[in-house]
């Protein structure tokens, strides 16, 4: 399951339990919309509640990251499970992404908000 919310710094995404291809499609749609609205939107990806992911989702995720490697600003990832963290780091090695990893949401949000003046705000192009 996935929840996606627009924030002043970009998108805040929380993954719950299993991250499926259907969840990724929702994320992809939100990310593409954010790219249209703001140059280099920031992303907070909270994986602390994620327990597993499907292989088809992982393949689509890699494809998307390769296609849009230079379309995003900062990416903050919240994760506490060592295996999920290793998997995320491996995926980022394949895609040239350089996210920063955090243990808590507050610190991650603060880091993303520091970059807001450089990346714009979601919905500011109205």
For each of these PLM feature ranges, what is it?
Residues 1-126:
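Amphipathic, Lys/Arg-enriched alpha-helical "gate/interface" segment within cytosolic domains
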